[in-house]
Amino acid sequence: LSKISKILFILNNFVSKCHHKKEEKFIFPYLINKGGEEASLANEMINQHRVIENLENQLESNLNIKSLQKINQILTDFVMILDSHILEENSVVFAYAEISIDEFEKEIVLKKIGYFEKENSELCNKDKYLKILNEL
């Protein structure tokens, strides 16, 4: 259970509070403003972020009561949604973003993301999370 707690720590902090926040604050608004399929994709990704956060909360609750069967089911659900989410994000959503956001705006977005990462360096420190994973 201690290893699962460490994975949950990474999911809560890096995935939800850093990675998802950057997408929702800096990338998805452009797609939503574009409308059409781009907006639908961005909204679907945001909905999936909420599902992932819900699974994080469920996992935390079940870790606290040491419900191994439920923890196993939640982890299975995590694998399923993260697998499809990452595939869709990398193969479809970011392709639309690449096309939809002009070069000038991309520079602005990248600067804003860089500033966000500096302001949230504790949450967005990939090396810290890689170290935790390597220790598992």
Where are these regions (language model features)?
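Small-residue-biased structural context
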Residues: 1-136
